[in-house]
Amino acid sequence: MSDLETALSLLQNKLRRQILERLVREPHYPMQLANLLGVSQQAIVKHLKELERGNFVMKMKLPSEKGGPPRTIYSVQQSMSLRIDLGPDLFSVEQRSLPAG
């Protein structure tokens, strides 16, 4: 699957788009996302793994403040633009990378 096809496939899911909406603002733990979006942590983790495979997000292990096992936090990994032009005698889909920030 091409990068464009991967991006379109991943973004067709509404929950994944909602997850990305939160992660572009700031990194989150899966449980935070589950609480914010009103779905199970298991569902969030499943979608985060898909987004990670597509290089949309990355995970980092942070030490626990209470001395427990490290906690996993997710953040957006890349800046990109998808553009779809559609009309009579017109169909164009374009993906391009954007500078970070």
Regions found by a protein language model. Name each.
Residues 35, 52-53:
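Alpha-helical residues within the helix-turn-helix
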Residues 47:
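Residues within the DNA-recognition helix of helix-turn-helix
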Residues 65-101:
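Conserved segment of winged-helix/HTH DNA-binding domains
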Residues 14, 25-31:
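Short capping segments at the starts of secondary-structure elements
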Residues 53-68:
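Beta-hairpin "wing" of winged helix-turn-helix
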Residues 42:
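Key DNA-contact positions within bacterial/archaeal DNA-binding proteins
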